[in-house]
Design a protein with these regions (language model features):
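Glycine-rich adenosyl-nucleotide cofactor-binding module
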Residues: 1-13
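C-terminal, charged low-complexity interaction regions
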Residues: 131-134
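Iron-sulfur cluster-binding cysteine motifs and their immediate structural context
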Residues: 10-32, 51-56, 60-79
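Short Fe-S-cluster ligation motifs
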Residues: 38-56, 87-110
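Extended alpha-helical surfaces
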Residues: 69, 75-91, 106
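Long, compositionally biased charged/polar accessory segments in the mid-to-C-terminal portions
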Residues: 102-103, 110-128
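Alpha-helical structural motif
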Residues: 26, 84-88, 96, 117
């Protein structure tokens, strides 16, 4: 069955980039999009990335959507095993490109490459230092 949006506003409230506005969606401020975007980012884009600790993707809207509550766990083992919930920034940054490919080459984020992910780590770290809170 097709599930229509309930217009509860949860996604609008939680979105780090405020990309939802009624029925409109602005992908250019979506954190998931920005974590994959190549090149330098504007200060505003950097701040959006730094709002959550994820270096790739976001899915905050999916997390709060009522349609995603109480759904059954997938029967596909590949989606339930070998999960990665944390990456140590320092260890990640010290990997050579070859080590990165060997360690993370089969992960969904690996196609974007190490440099973009390190850039995202940096934005998150910079925004969440004691100095940035002043």
């Amino acid at each position: 069955t097709k599930k229509e949006c309930l217009h509860c506003g949860n996604c609008e409230k939680i979105c780090p980039g405020k990309c939802f506005s009624g029925s409109a969606y602005n992908f250019a401020t979506c954190k998931s999009y920005l974590t994959q975007k190549k090149g330098d980012l504007t200060v505003q884009e950097q701040k959006i990335i730094a709002k959550t600790p994820y270096i790739f993707g976001c899915d905050e809207c999916q997390r709060v959507c009522p349609h995603n509550k109480n759904i059954p766990v997938t029967p596909l083992a590949d989606f339930r095993t070998d999960l990665l919930s944390y990456v140590d920034a320092r260890a990640f940054k010290n990997l050579t490109n070859r080590q990165f490919k060997e360690t993370y080459g089969k992960r969904a984020f690996s196609w974007r490459g190490k440099a973009i992910l390190i850039r995202n780590f940096t934005y998150i770290e910079q925004e969440n230092t004691p100095e940035s809170k002043k």
